[in-house]
Amino acid sequence: MEKDLSREAYYYHLPEENIAQKPADKRDHSKLMVLNTSTGKVEHKIFNNVLEYINPGDMLIVNNTKVFPARLTGHKESGGKVEVFLLELPTYIRPGVSESIALIKSSRKPKVGSTLTINEALSCRVTEQLAGGKARLQLHYDKDVDVTEILAGIGEIPLPPYIKREEGTTPEDVTRYQTVYANVPGAVAAPTAGLHFTEELLQSLRENGIQFGEVTLHVGYGTFAPVRAENIVEHNIHEEFVSVGQETVDKIIATRKAGGKIWAVGTTTVRSLEFAAAQHGGQIAATEGWCALYIYPGFKFQVIDNLITNFHLPDSSLMFLVSALCRREKLLECYQMAIKEDYRFFSYGDAMAVISGE
């Protein structure tokens, strides 16, 4: 157990060619590794074969957050180029004015009070410098226009830092770096396990008697923050906004009573559900708030049985979470197997199903 708490125990070497730089040709044609934690058996499938494992009466829960066009480019008062990465959806202040927190990339840090011009429709005034290279911004635009409409027209979908392509963000990313069920804007990164689902696959699951539920967790930039603490317990996990509604809670309780399994699509869904239970003495209940739940080996899951996830970065908090379900040694063994079998890793990569098999 002591080794499970050492950051370096989660390191593995990943060849560059295994980092997916673009999505699979079809969402549900990516590879799927299936790990049964009860038997240790590993199977290699195509993602739409997930139908073979989710039984009638089980419940599949997804994160419905939607990535918003958070990356903006413009210029400073001096004329120098500036890149603004909004870390949260702008908050309405009054007509024509909203506020947000952003990372600002430029040759020199803009001063408080300075204006960053994105285009003729949008400018940003720096109102406060914050820690970690962040700044508080006031966004100014036409009072008859919604700021989200402006962002949709001029902003770019932010891709993770390990997607390095000469062409940058493409029109394909606008749809493919978004789940088909995304409907609540607020994330700066996609809940990537959900990228494998198509409308047709979801319909097939419904026809098979699978229940569905939704949660909202707005994935923040902190999801890419490296773990620096040698002992993973000392890592400060990032906060993200979570909402778990009563309808989803009622379905979970009914599924449990009927003997069905709870499937979480993605680590963000796991955190949302387990946070909702932790807030209420281990019993799932409707919850809304800021989640800083940190899951690593030794954690006792109260809600979920099975997990669909992607392959994660070495020694990352997401690896810790998956290891809490399937043992660190087994996870690393699966990752080595995935590299050998040419699986694609990270956001646009292939998937893994971790099932209890009981």
Swiss-Prot record:
Keywords: Cytoplasm, Queuosine biosynthesis, S-adenosyl-L-methionine, Transferase. It is found in: Cytoplasm. Its main location: cytoplasm. Gene3D superfamilies: QueA-like (3.40.1780.10). Pfam families: Queuosine_synth. One of its GO terms (cellular component) is cytoplasm. It comes from Desulfotalea psychrophila (strain LSv54 / DSM 12343). HAMAP family: QueA. Belongs to the QueA family. SUPFAM superfamilies: QueA-like (SSF111337). Pathway: tRNA modification; tRNA-queuosine biosynthesis. Transfers and isomerizes the ribose moiety from AdoMet to the 7-aminomethyl group of 7-deazaguanine (preQ1-tRNA) to give epoxyqueuosine (oQ-tRNA). Monomer. It is an enzyme of class 2 (transferase). Its EC number is 2.4.99.17. This is S-adenosylmethionine:tRNA ribosyltransferase-isomerase.
